[in-house]
Amino acid sequence: MVMIERRVDLRSDTVTKPTEAMRAAMARAEVDDDVLGYDPTAARLEKEMAKIMGKEAALFVPSGTMANLISVLIHCEIRGSEVILGDYSHIHIYENGGISTIGGVHPRTVKNNEDGTMDIHLIEEAIRNPNFAICYPTTRLICLENSHAHSGGRCLTVEYTDKVGELAKKHGLKLHIDGARIFNASVALGVPVSRLVQAADSVTACLSKGLGAPAGTIIAGSKSFISKVGVICAAALVALEENVGKLENDHKKAKILAEGLNKIKGLKVDLAYVETNIVYFEILEDSSITEIELFKYLEAHGILVMPEGPLK
């Protein structure tokens, strides 16, 4: 029988635990009733994140799904509006269809390339002709995702994001960036977060993934976009102050893992795709082990992974 002394959980960067510094910050956090207008720790976090994002204001919410939903609904405040987004974007696949069921917003998908981008000309072709608004939804928003989870953590460059921003302005649209892992993209590209999201009218950033806070996501944008809607904020501040600098080491470890997996017969990793902290590996058809057998073997040895597809 295998004795597991330590479990290695590789399923997702969401399975993080607060550090001792975070726990201490939570214990001594100055709090108040945010509903009545002011929670000092929440206000400090929002001010700091607005500065980092290069935006006028920010708002703390419990989850990334909620943050993206709020952002889309603000930009598409009229029911029947349409948002253009990638067919493999997190908003489209993993967020319960909330923009449609709650907000009455219609998603119009454009094919995601392997690097997480969408072809600029395809985005433009997807924009509805306003002269036919009696028949079609009205396009009001374009959404990007950086880094792109389904593409293995690939990063959108400043040049690409700026081009999409220019396209949005040309057609009178807004641009939202799902930046759940925007700090990973910043570290990988060597570009400040504020520059990566400069073209965006709104951006979300998760604090509980690679940064390790217990929960929470920030929405940032203009003051008119953000209206005032912490214990958790205290931990999130520690995540910002202490853990952003550790992301580069996470990326290095991911590359080491990918290189090691690639040496195992029957497994394959496209190393060119490992830019940040996400590693996808394929189980080749001629492999001597099946997906289920591999997962059970790893779990028995204290290593947890998450399936993405039949052989991935």
What kind of feature is each model-predicted range?
Residues 2-311:
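Conserved PLP-enzyme active-site core in the AAT-like
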